[in-house]
A protein has these predicted regions:
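N-terminal secretory signal peptides and thylakoid transit peptides that target proteins
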Residues: 1-13
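Glycine-centered hinge/linker elements that transmit conformational signals in sensory
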Residues: 171-173, 211-243, 296
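Hinge/lid segment of periplasmic solute-binding proteins
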Residues: 91-144, 195, 285-295, 363
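C-terminal lobe and pocket-closing loops
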Residues: 93, 266-287, 299-399, 429
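Conserved C-terminal helix/tail region of periplasmic/extracytoplasmic solute-binding proteins
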Residues: 29, 60-61, 100, 153, ...
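Short, polar/charged alpha-helical segment
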Residues: 39-60, 400
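Extracytoplasmic/periplasmic solute-binding protein
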Residues: 130-138, 143, 168-215, 221, ...
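Short, well-ordered beta-strand elements
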Residues: 27-38, 60-64, 86-87
């Protein structure tokens, strides 16, 4: 973003022109809560930038990093109590759910979008409510199936299966060799829902019709998807995945316990950065045996993907909303955002399209290139309807994830679907 835009947005043109920091009240502070990143160096970079931002803004900048599964409880508690962090990281379309507690940040968001090639469509669905930006789009977490090249070669495969049926057959052979697929299907923010929703869509299933007002989950495609996953789970998967969160599959892959898993780029990146300690069964660096396939293998209705849009929202209860917006503007300046972006190596990609052309993409390893345009391909929670607060509520209650989890634990496919349909009707039609 141009410096002039930054000055205009923060309303401190005269002060910065005089080479002084903005004159916020003495002791002013902006507190940002984000997840603990799966790329540790990304958090290190933000911590490094905090003093620079503090100097630029003339106020203290504090980053706090917490487990991603604790973000929603903290956001809810802050809104209910009227106190807490000034800025929260938002995932998916959470701004829809918390709209009444968020500041309009359209001035910041629109300036970033104009300067950086426009935001991806997913962010309009995620962070715009009633035509207003209630969070500033920050990045997208893509996902892909990380898979062991050598293990798949043992069963005659040189590329990853293209269809769910082919993946089930490959997984069956690998599980028989003690090398199962590993899939998180517990209550966790990322891997379970990004798998479950994409899987549902690949069979033609959806929560609602395009209006978002009528539940249409009970369909032939959904029933088939539940039945297939039940068989896939038994034939191909590590069945302990029912209790996994977003960290378990990373650890299992690095430990050589699973052959493939849907994940972001972190399994590869961390394995390479810790090549001296993360090794395969032959004692060689594990990263050399990792490939990525994206999106998930196709179901009867084709391929589908759910990636994770990230945004930052300023809370209405904040005593320093102008300062908070100033920080978001500063964070999105090209030189500041670019340093954070490069550290990620494709794990988190830009929210704006200009970052697809960043020189980093010419330098990073081929398995990471699959994430370059990930944000163009994602659907949003609520598909095939709009990404409303009701869609976020459904996600937050893990209804689609639990439909599959109940089935793989022994509930009849039709009964698991009926349960999920009933829960969705309480939200969408109640």
């Amino acid at each position: 973003m141009e410096r002039r835009t930054f000055i205009t947005l923060t309303g401190v043109a005269g002060i910065l022109a005089a080479h002084r920091a903005p004159a916020f009240a003495q002791g002013s502070k902006v507190h940002v809560v984000r997840w603990v990143d799966f790329i540790p160096e990304a958090d290190v970079e933000l911590k490094r930038q905090a003093p620079e931002a503090s100097k630029a803004l003339g106020a203290e900048v504090q980053f706090e990093f917490i487990n991603a599964n604790d973000l929603q409880p903290r956001i809810t508690a802050g809104i209910q109590s009227g106190s807490g962090a000034d800025i929260f990281q938002m995932l998916y379309n959470w701004p829809q759910l918390y709209a009444n507690g968020l500041v309009d940040v359209s001035d910041v968001a629109e300036a970033v979008s104009r300067a950086q090639g426009g935001f991806y469509d997913a962010f309009d669905a995620a962070a715009k409510v009633g035509g207003r930006w209630l969070a500033v789009p920050h990045s997208t977490g893509g996902n892909a199936v990380a898979w062991r090249r050598s293990w798949h070669a043992e069963i005659g495969l040189t590329e990853f299966p293209k269809t769910m049926d082919a993946w089930r057959e490959a997984g069956r052979k690998l599980k028989a060799k003690g090398k199962p697929v590993g899939q998180a299907l517990g209550h966790s923010f990322g891997d379970p829902p990004t798998f479950a929703y994409a899987f549902l869509w690949s069979y033609g299933g959806a929560e609602t019709d395009p209006s978002g007002k009528r539940v249409v989950l009970n369909s032939k495609g959904t029933v088939e998807s539940v039945k297939f996953l039940t068989a896939f789970w038994k034939d191909a998967c590590d069945e302990g995945g029912l209790a996994w969160d977003d960290t378990n599959n990373n650890r299992a892959f690095h430990a050589g316990e699973i052959s493939a898993t849907l994940n972001g780029a972190s399994i590869y990146i961390v394995a390479k950065r810790k090549k001296d300690t993360i090794k395969d069964e032959k004692g060689e660096p594990l990263w050399q045996d990792i490939e990525h396939a994206a999106p998930l293998p196709a179901g009867p209705a084709g391929e589908a993907a759910l990636y994770v849009p990230f945004q930052h929202a300023v809370m209405k209860y904040s005593k320093n909303p102008k300062l908070a917006k100033g920080l978001l503007t500063w964070m999105h300046q090209k030189e500041n955002y670019g340093k954070w972006f490069e550290v990620n190596e494709g794990y988190s990609v830009g929210a704006a399209k200009a970052w697809e052309e960043h020189p980093m993409w010419a330098k990073i390893d081929k398995p990471l290139q699959v994430f370059r345009r990930a944000a163009r391909k994602t659907r949003m929670l609520g598909y095939q309807g709009p990404a409303t607060a009701k869609a976020t509520e459904s996600y937050s209650k893990y209804i689609i994830v639990d439909m599959y989890a109940k089935a793989v634990q022994g509930m009849k496919a039709e009964d698991a679907l009926k349960w999920a349909e009933g829960e969705l009707k309480k939200i969408y039609e109640g």
